[in-house]
Swiss-Prot record:
Cellular compartments annotated: Virion tegument; Host nucleus; Host cytoplasm
Organism: Equine herpesvirus 1 (strain V592) (EHV-1)
Note: Expressed in late in the infection.
Keyword Protein biosynthesis tagged: no
Annotated spans, Disordered: 1-212
Name of the protein in its database record: Tegument protein UL47 homolog
Assembly and oligomerization: Interacts with US3 kinase. Interacts with UL31 and UL34; these interactions seem important for efficient virion nuclear egress. Interacts with UL41/VHS.
Motif (Nuclear localization signal): 13-33
Primary localization class, coarse: virion
Annotated domain remarks: The nuclear export signal is CRM1-dependent.
Compositionally biased tracts (Polar residues): 30-41, 59-81
Any single Gene Ontology cellular-component annotation: host cell nucleus
Record's function text: Tegument protein that can bind to various RNA transcripts. Plays a role in the attenuation of selective viral and cellular mRNA degradation by modulating the activity of host shutoff RNase UL41/VHS. Also plays a role in the primary envelopment of virions in the perinuclear space, probably by interacting with two nuclear egress proteins UL31 and UL34.
Keywords: Host cytoplasm, Host nucleus, Late protein, Transcription, Transcription regulation, Virion, Virion tegument
Length: 871
């Protein structure tokens, strides 16, 4: 018996049961000490990376030799009762038990910080990542690899000192250069000795690294920093981190918007040129009939039918009404102190570049009296305005900052964005990290330029804003005519057929042409892409960041100032929640959140179109010789803005159609992200309607300064709204293309968004899907935050929960529709429709693999799941 059973002593033995973690996650990386079988089981990530399931022959031989050697100290370590007694009474010293090595995707990153508040509250143990989610992210994201393990693996794509296009690989590899594992490690003394020899060759080598003629700037410091970074990775992580940060700052200073190395296209893209040429010819003219040119003494008389159709006035946000009632300066200040001679001396009282040669300075400032916006804003006034922003009550209860001087505290280390068990809850750790990330993505780029360049004052932003707004109005002129001729030629074939998005929008568009007699200054045949200067590049970037500039908000004066602050704060809250619920390691959202995101994207895009048509008409009225004709009653009448959002029946009906959907109503009240998104939407809707109402009241014999200030305030809000839509669309598209989630979207939302983004090109530089997620990962790395899948670990599970749905939401849905159909289109699959917008939305440099995850279920290697879509 002893001959057959050895250490068991004849006693029966029970096979040890695998742990829960082993049974839930059988695919383990090579080298895991918990595996008891000899053949390594590789995950699908390993299969995609080219690893094989067979070990090295020498390694197999050594393992066999070790297993064949007899044990002299009970090395077999039987787990039976008799074996336990043998070990107790044996003279051999038992080996120290080794704790199993945790999986990298379940362990927090090294050096992860926790606030004292997070450590006070303990929660249940960390739940393992669902196996289906692991397979879904296998070929796109590094779910389980820690930063230390990545540094030890050689990347075959890094063949030079500079990274190639990020689109040549999978998305999440965003061009970060790491040292190869195959390089021989050297001691510090050897490296110091070599540095003396390399110093003599730096001057020659640094200038020979880049041979491309397009790189004209000497970047010796950048090249040297990259080489030092590669060497530091083999020495210590702390030195590597410091050099990486310095390299990143050097690159940012060179290639950030407005930097010396930042390139801007001087002419419209080929796509825009083709879009305008194919849709309208030189001989095309619009002849409008009717009484448009007659004087309109009572603009409200044309809207009496609205009073009978809509029996209840438009509901405004209760929080907005409270903000206005508590505002200390609710009206326009007429005693603004500024010296016209000083403005002329500073070369500020000049015609915007868009109208140079068309209007002289005196004529332009007579039509748009905006010189008061150049008045000096004191530091105390700016500080009080920033403080008013921070003192606004947020949904999450934490203070939000609008500028660099008021940064938030956050915990470094892992960022966990999984849903919480509580309804309307969110992890506080992720929320604080998202606040810091939102500041870095949307605010710090502008604030760094403003604070570091003393020559950048708010009047430069005012000049950019008025110029960009006028250029946008001219693009509205062109787009409205392109849509008219697209409708006329919708049945043509071949070269005469307009672009399909124009045909789809032509029957439902709200961009309507104005009579040629009142829009001569707006006439153009190609799309305007705006100024191309260093300052304009900064003002156009960062998702519409000008609203965060306190001096600029104050320069516009009330009522524009208070409305801009109100909109900026609540859209910032929405984006914080968006960032706190997804990242590259977990790009998906819950079903309810996706429903709310699609609803807001659809309604906000339509609202942007309504507002751009208002800008189109208001700009023509401000520049016209006679501003009381019937062609301008769209902006002169007050009844529309009292009954419908932004004075639009179409938007009124669209809100009823979308918000009355039971799925949308449930999503609105059940998740924190949905509430933040809806409050952000209704904040913009309320502020824009209020500004348009103030404009109509002052346009008839009121203050022209107030009219001009409101006009500029609407432009500032629209820039932030368009940037928010860009932000929201990239998050939603990332869930569809990178997360593999099935998302239904209204068919006309993406065509409408694409056209409006072209129209607003002078005001906003939109960011593509690929660039958005790459920049997001880069900024997380700068903040020392690591995206992690699953829920946070024990001690970091504090939840910020909204106990009840917001009081602002229930009364915002219209009670009934006025007309049949809102022109939103039918529901289609978002991943499929995005394939038609690879240049405008996904990104011109995107590879063909981007988006396949949304078209094919990401169950790589599992035949039962292949081809299925996530429900």
């Amino acid at each position: 018996m002893d001959q057959h059973h050895g250490a068991r002593g004849g006693a029966p033995i029970r096979r040890p049961r695998r742990s829960i973690e082993s049974r839930s996650h059988p695919f383990r990386a090579t080298g895991n000490t918990q595996r008891t079988y000899s053949t390594p089981r590789l995950s699908y990530r390993d299969g995609l990376s080219g690893r094989t399931a067979s070990r090295d022959p020498q390694e197999q031989a050594s393992n066999q030799d070790e297993s064949s050697n007899p044990s002299t100290s009970n090395a077999q370590q039987s787990t039976s009762f008799w074996g336990y007694l043998r070990r107790v009474f044996s003279d051999d010293v038992p080996a120290q038990p080794q704790a199993p090595r945790p999986r990298a995707d379940f362990a927090p990153p090294a050096g992860e910080e926790s606030s004292s508040e997070e450590e006070e509250e303990e929660g249940p143990a960390q739940a393992p990542l669902d196996e289906e989610d692991q397979l879904m992210y296998a070929d796109q994201y590094s779910v389980g690899d820690s930063s230390d393990e990545n540094d030890e693996e050689e990347d075959p794509r890094l063949g030079s000192d500079y990274p190639t296009s990020a689109e040549s690989s999978e998305y999440h590899d965003h061009g970060e250069m790491v040292a190869g594992a195959g390089a021989e490690s050297e001691s510090e003394t050897d490296i110091d000795a070599e540095e003396e020899e390399e110093d003599d060759e730096d001057d020659e080598d640094d200038m020979e690294v880049i041979r491309d003629e397009s790189y004209r700037l000497p970047r010796t410091w950048l090249d040297k920093s990259i080489r030092l970074m590669d060497e530091a990775l083999a020495q210590s992580s702390e030195l590597s981190k410091a050099i990486t940060k310095s390299t990143r700052s050097l690159y940012d200073s060179q290639f950030a918007p407005g930097g010396r190395g930042y390139t801007q296209t001087a002419t419209p893209s080929r796509r825009l040129v083709q879009l305008s040429r194919a849709g309208m010819y030189d001989s095309d003219k619009i002849v409008m009939t009717g009484d448009y040119m007659e004087v309109d003494d009572d603009p409200d008389s044309a809207y009496q039918l609205w009073v009978r159709a809509i029996r209840h006035p438009l509901a405004m946000n209760p929080s907005w009404e409270e903000t206005i009632s508590n505002h200390t300066n609710p009206s326009f200040s007429t005693d603004i102190d500024y010296d016209i001679d000083e403005l002329i001396e500073k070369n500020l009282a000049r015609t915007p570049p868009v109208f140079e040669g068309l209007l002289d300075s005196a004529e332009f400032f007579y039509k748009l009296p905006m010189l008061y916006t150049y008045a000096t804003i004191t530091q105390d006034e700016a500080y009080e305005e920033r403080l008013a922003w921070s003192n606004t009550q947020a949904l999450h209860g934490h203070e939000q900052s609008s500028w660099q001087a008021l940064l938030v505290y956050y915990s470094r280390g892992g960022m966990y964005v999984s849903p919480t068990q509580e309804p309307r809850g969110i992890w506080r750790r992720a929320l604080k990290q998202a606040m810091a990330l939102q500041l870095k993505m949307c605010v710090l780029g502008l604030s760094d330029v403003v604070t570091k360049q003393n020559a950048t004052h708010h009047h430069t932003a005012v000049t950019f804003l008025v110029d960009a707004l006028l250029r946008t109005a001219r693009n509205c002129y062109l787009a409205s005519r392109l849509l008219v001729f697209a409708w006329e030629r919708r049945r043509e074939t071949g070269a005469k057929r307009p672009a399909e998005p124009l045909i789809a929008l032509s029957g439902v568009t709200l961009l309507q042409p104005l009579p040629p007699e009142v829009s001569e200054l707006l006439e153009q045949r190609t799309f305007d892409i705006g100024l191309r200067t260093p300052n304009s590049a900064v003002f156009r970037a960062f998702f519409g960041s000008l609203v965060y500039w306190a001096e600029l908000r104050l320069a516009l004066r009330d009522p524009a100032s208070i409305n801009c602050r109100y909109v900026g704060f609540h859209l910032q809250t929405s984006e914080i929640y968006l960032l706190a619920r997804a990242h590259s390691a977990s790009p998906g959202y819950t079903k309810e959140e996706l429903v709310a995101m699609e609803a807001i994207l659809t309604l906000a895009t339509l609202m942007l179109e309504v507002a751009l048509q208002w800008v189109h008409v208001a700009c023509a009225q401000l520049l016209s010789e006679n501003d009381t004709i019937k062609a301008f009653r769209r902006v002169s009448a007050s009844i529309p803005h009292a009954l419908a959002p932004l004075g639009s029946i179409r938007l009124h009906d669209a809100e009823f159609e979308v918000l009355s959907n039971p799925d949308v109503m449930v999503a609105r009240d059940e998740t924190a992200l949905s509430q933040a998104l809806f409050l952000g939407y209704f904040s913009v809707r309320t502020a824009l309607t209020a500004c348009m109402r103030d404009y109509s009241h002052e346009a008839d014999g009121g203050s022209k300064e107030t009219v001009t200030g409101v006009f500029l305030g609407v432009g500032l809000i629209l820039q932030r709204l368009a940037g928010h839509l860009n932000f929201l669309l990239n998050c939603l598209a990332g869930a569809a293309l990178y997360g593999g989630q099935k998302i239904n979207i209204h068919s006309l939302t993406l065509p409408r968004y694409s056209l409006l983004a072209d129209v607003m090109a002078p005001m906003l530089q939109r960011q593509s899907l690929v660039d958005f997620w790459r920049a997001r990962d880069n900024m997380l790395e700068d903040l020392e935050i690591t995206p992690r899948p699953g829920p946070p670990t024990q001690g970091k599970r504090v939840v910020v929960e909204m106990p009840l749905p917001s009081d602002d939401l229930p009364d915002m849905t219209p009670g009934a529709s006025v007309n049949n159909g809102a022109g939103l289109g039918r529901m289609v699959d978002m991943a499929k429709q995005l394939q038609h917008y690879r240049e405008t939305i996904i990104g011109e440099e995107a590879t063909s693999s981007v988006g396949k995850r949304g078209l094919i279920r990401a169950g790589v290697g599992v035949a039962a799941l292949r081809g299925r879509r996530r429900k």
